[in-house]
């Protein structure tokens, strides 16, 4: 039986990062993955969706070309070619991870892992094997959650795991869930010419995000023909010829039917726990309970990523993976969650970090906010993408930035600048004293900071 210092179960953005970091600390490491390297993010999530969102961006640019004095003829879409490009991106990144594992001298096992007593890991698959670990890191991720809707299992429906495998563009699509996954797919399919309906139980889409950001996106997607039903619950689904009929009730009990060719269920995700089924772990609801060092209730057993809840984000899983690897290799390190950037790749983009206004007030902060509208930003106007804003949330006494929300072009790239400021306990005054390049959307940060101080030039 082979023995390793550390065995990582799961090859997603948390698992493979943990394995590589542990290897760089001089440990003998094994990584087990039952699917493809890269996990959900690379194969069925972050990366393929961004590849298709790029297609959506290009489609809209072509459709809007006449606004810029460019006349084009009829546009033809090839879904097979789009999927081919998406798969090329995935395969290239998969190969990159495999190369990193090889150069890091990490043993890779393809199969399903189950943790047995005494740090034994049993691997089933093409080549069954048992290995022993000094420490184990569980990074098995999550799967799409499917609600118990009457009739849903009797019709064909999609989740984020299967929607990337469609073979033709649907004429209509009903999306159950108006969170991040739902609105991103709505943007993709609307660009392809699909009639999209979003059905959301809350009173707005992106209910956990900034309310004004949600309002801006709601207004924009409405202009593009996407129908949004809020305070709505799908009670039943049934086949209607080649289509599906969704029976929906609003909070007042009024019934409304939506007919669509395809259904996408996007209500959230549930943790994959089969690897630890033989263990008596302390749980936090459906998730594995861990401390700030990513340690579970079982000695020498760590858990990271979607199985522990917290933030179900790839970059958080990677950060947790590094923390777990460091602790497993004898370097005491705590995980920090107060500066987690969050990005939504819709049109316009949404990005945020730190505390919202509500959260800051609940934590007892005396805060002051400022906002700069991109409608007066030169670069945004020149680019034809002037819908959006930059909002800064800062401590009223010292001006320390505790949170930010941005809506507009390139904000998913800009948010890291705010994260860096917060990490260094930066203030709005320090930001207002920076020289920003002109013309850029990032000048919105300067304007918002200056406005917070009551010294804004363009606000």
Which positions does each model-derived feature cover?
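FAD-site-proximal beta/loop scaffold in flavoenzymes
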Residues: 153-170, 257-328
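Gly/Ala-rich phosphate-binding loop of Rossmann-like dinucleotide-binding domains
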Residues: 19, 23, 186, 190-191
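Short hydrophobic core segments
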Residues: 7-9, 113, 131-141, 176, ...
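FAD-binding beta-loop-beta segment adjacent to the flavin cofactor pocket
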Residues: 144, 286-300, 379-391, 395
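Beta1/beta-strand and adjacent pyrophosphate-binding region of the FAD-binding site
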Residues: 1-12, 169-179
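Glycine-rich flavin
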Residues: 2-4, 20-27, 32-169, 197, ...
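Flexible, glycine-rich terminal cap/loop adjacent to redox cofactors
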Residues: 9-14, 23-35, 40, 47, ...
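N-terminal Rossmann-fold NAD(P) dinucleotide-binding loop
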Residues: 15, 182-183
């Amino acid at each position: 039986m082979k023995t390793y210092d550390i065995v990582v179960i799961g090859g997603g953005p948390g698992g493979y990062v943990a394995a590589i970091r542990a290897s760089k600390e001089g440990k003998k490491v094994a990584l087990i993955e039952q699917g493809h390297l890269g996990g959900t993010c690379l194969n069925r999530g972050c990366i393929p969706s961004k590849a298709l969102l790029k297609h959506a961006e290009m489609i809209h640019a072509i459709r809007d070309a006449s606004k810029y004095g460019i006349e084009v003829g009829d546009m033809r879409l090839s879904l097979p070619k789009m999927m081919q490009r998406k798969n090329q991106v995935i395969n290239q990144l998969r190969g990159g991870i495999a190369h990193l594992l090889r150069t890091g001298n990490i043993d890779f096992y393809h199969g399903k892992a189950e943790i047995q007593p005494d740090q034994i890991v049993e691997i089933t698959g093409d080549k069954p094997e048992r290995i022993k670990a000094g420490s184990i890191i569980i990074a098995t991720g999550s799967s799409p959650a499917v609600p118990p809707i009457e009739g849903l299992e009797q019709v064909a429906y999609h989740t984020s795991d299967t929607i990337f495998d469609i073979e033709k563009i649907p004429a209509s699509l009903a999306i159950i869930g108006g969170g991040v996954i739902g609105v991103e797919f709505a943007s993709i399919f609307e660009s392809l010419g699909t009639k999209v309906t979003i059905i959301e139980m809350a009173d707005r889409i992106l209910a956990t995000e900034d309310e004004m950001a949600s309002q801006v996106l709601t207004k924009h997607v409405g202009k593009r023909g996407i129908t949004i039903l809020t305070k709505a619950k799908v009670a039943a689904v049934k086949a209607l010829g080649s289509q599906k009929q969704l029976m929906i009730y609003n909070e007042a009990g009024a019934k409304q039917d939506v007919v669509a060719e395809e259904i996408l269920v996007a209500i959230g995700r549930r943790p994959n726990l089969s690897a630890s089924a033989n263990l008596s772990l302390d749980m936090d609801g459906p998730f594995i309970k861990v401390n700030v060092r990513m340690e579970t209730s079982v000695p020498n057993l760590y858990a990271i990523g979607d199985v522990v809840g917290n933030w179900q984000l790839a970059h958080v899983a990677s950060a947790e993976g590094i923390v777990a690897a460091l602790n497993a290799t004898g370097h005491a390190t705590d995980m920090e969650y107060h500066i987690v950037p969050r990005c939504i790749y819709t049109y316009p983009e949404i990005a945020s970090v730190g505390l919202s206004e509500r959260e800051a007030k609940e934590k007892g902060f005396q805060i002051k906010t400022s906002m700069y509208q991109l409608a007066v930003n030169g670069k945004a106007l020149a680019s034809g993408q002037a819908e959006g804003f930059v909002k800064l949330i800062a401590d009223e006494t010292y001006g320390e930035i505790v949170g930010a929300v941005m809506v507009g072009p390139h904000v998913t790239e800009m948010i890291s600048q705010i994260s860096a400021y917060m990490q260094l306990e930066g203030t709005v005054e320090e930001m207002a004293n920076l020289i920003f390049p002109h013309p850029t959307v990032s000048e919105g940060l300067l304007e918002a900071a200056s406005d917070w101080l009551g010294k804004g030039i363009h606000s």
